[in-house]
């Protein structure tokens, strides 16, 4: 097939998610930003080649991780230089025109997260877009944060679960 080079410097860390036939790529390389690559162009490849990203969003520098909520068309980027490393909200409904629409900084660095449209028994949150984040300040303050991110310009903290002195809140995935 070929390769898509890094946007800046080499880094062993990349995270890639796919949405609407596009790969969304972040890296911890300085100033990498978000690369967007249209995967449909791979259908006609006959010889290996070097590809170029279709779009590069440079608003946030580097990032550790990305999650895409396919139901809402939003990407959530974690560990950037914006919002103290908290989640950054990017509208990717048009994959070739991503737009930063907000973020959340109140609870320090978010290492990873999962975002869902809530469909549980609590009617207050039914149909709302909810972020579950694994947060750490790099020391003893580790927590899981639960944020209503339905309104990107006004995220609202619902709750948190504190994991002080217990290691690192690295990642968490819902089971149902």
Question: What positions do the PLM features span?
Answer:
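Feature marking well-ordered beta-strand scaffolds used for ligand recognition
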Residues: 1-176
């Amino acid at each position: 097939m070929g390769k898509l080079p890094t946007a800046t410097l080499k880094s062993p860390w990349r995270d890639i998610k796919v949405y609407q036939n596009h790969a969304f790529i972040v890296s911890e390389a300085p100033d990498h930003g978000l690369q967007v690559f249209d995967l449909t162009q791979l259908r006609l490849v006959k010889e290996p080649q070097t590809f170029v990203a279709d779009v590069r969003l440079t608003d946030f520098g580097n990032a550790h991780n990305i999650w895409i909520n396919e139901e809402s068309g939003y990407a959530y980027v974690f560990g950037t230089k914006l919002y103290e490393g908290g989640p950054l909200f990017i509208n990717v409904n048009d994959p070739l025109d991503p737009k930063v629409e907000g973020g959340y900084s109140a609870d320090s660095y978010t290492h990873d997260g999962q975002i869902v449209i809530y469909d549980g028994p609590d009617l207050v949150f039914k149909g709302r877009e909810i972020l579950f984040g694994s947060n750490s300040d790099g020391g003893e303050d580790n927590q899981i944060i639960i944020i209503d991110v339905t309104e990107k310009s006004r995220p609202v903290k619902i709750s948190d679960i504190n994991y002080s002195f217990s290691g690192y809140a690295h990642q968490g995935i819902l089971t149902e």
